[in-house]
Structure formats: structure tokens, C-alpha cells
């Protein structure tokens, strides 16, 4: 497994407000708090602060809260969507899940963890692309996956 990309000295960052201009996701499904660095059309590094107040912890699992794996994958997909949708020609489009390949869950993510989300776009043919993604907590890999996405026009 490759080490994650590091944040550059002169990073391109996005606050939560700026992120909301690119991604359509809103509470409770906005799973990236901010972007630490990104290169449009190539890669993005996001941050998610996992709090005990997240609604999914009420049922997964009350006595031993663990962030659901599908939500980790969604957070990675949203990070990749930042890279794809930050290109001027993709402004206002949606990035939809097309598939998940080779997902591996390596570490549980629990309340108090800070996720560093990495997604690198490795292929794109027309509106369909592939991203290699990983999420890290305290320097340890929590999940890796290859994600397929499709870009589409957003409804007005």
C-alpha cells in the first residue's frame, strides 16, 4: 500500500463553505469537513472529524460505536468528487458512484478520530472515471478502495 500524498507547502485549500459550492451534499450526508489540498482533475486530500454526535453512531453500535464502512467509502468518493468537479468544465455537475472495487477495511474508525481522506483520479474516459482512495487515522490506514464514478449534468 502506497503512503498517502502529503499536503503541499502552498496548498490549495477549501473551507466547508467553499466545499459546499462544489459538492451538493448537505447534512447529514456531507462527509468531508474541509479540503487540505487538491489539484483539479487529479487528486484531493480531505479531512473529516468524526464526532460522537454523528447520528449513525446511535445504531452502529451504541455500546461500541464504529463508523460504518459504507460511509467511509462515501467520504472517499466525496473527496474524489472534489478533484473531478473542481475542473471548470465540470462546474455544476454531479459525480455519481459507478462502482467499488477492492475495498479493504483495515482499522475501525471511532468517535474522536480525525480522518485524512485521499483520492487520486487515475483514469477518465469521457464521463466515467476511476479513483484510488485511502483513509487514514493517526498515520494508520483505515480503508483503501478503487472507486468508479460517472459525471452527469445536475438537475436545475
Where are these regions (language model features)?
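Hydrophobic beta-strand-centered segment that forms part of the acyl-chain substrate-binding groove
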Residues: 2-14, 80-116, 144-150
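Hydrophobic beta-sheet segments that form the core/acyl-binding groove
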Residues: 35, 101-138
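Intrinsic-disorder/low-complexity, polar/charged segments enriched in Ser/Thr/Lys/Arg/Asp/Glu/Gln
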Residues: 30, 41-45, 114-116, 128-130, ...
Amino acid at each position: 500500500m502506497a503512503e498517502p500524498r502529503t499536503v503541499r507547502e502552498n496548498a490549495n485549500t477549501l473551507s466547508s463553505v467553499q466545499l459546499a459550492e462544489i459538492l451538493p451534499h448537505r447534512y447529514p450526508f456531507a462527509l468531508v469537513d474541509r479540503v487540505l489540498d487538491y489539484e483539479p482533475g487529479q487528486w484531493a486530500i480531505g479531512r473529516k472529524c468524526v464526532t460522537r454526535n454523528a447520528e449513525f453512531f446511535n445504531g452502529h453500535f451504541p455500546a461500541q460505536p464504529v463508523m460504518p464502512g459504507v460511509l467511509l467509502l462515501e467520504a472517499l468518493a466525496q473527496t474524489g468528487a472534489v478533484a473531478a468537479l473542481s475542473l471548470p468544465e465540470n462546474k455544476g455537475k454531479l459525480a455519481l458512484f459507478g462502482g467499488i472495487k477492492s475495498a479493504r477495511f483495515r482499522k475501525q474508525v471511532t468517535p474522536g478520530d480525525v480522518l485524512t481522506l485521499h483520492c487520486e483520479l487515475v483514469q477518465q474516459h469521457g464521463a466515467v472515471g476511476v479513483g484510488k482512495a485511502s483513509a487514514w487515522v493517526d498515520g494508520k490506514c483505515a480503508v483503501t478502495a478503487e472507486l468508479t464514478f460517472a459525471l452527469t449534468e445536475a438537475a436545475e
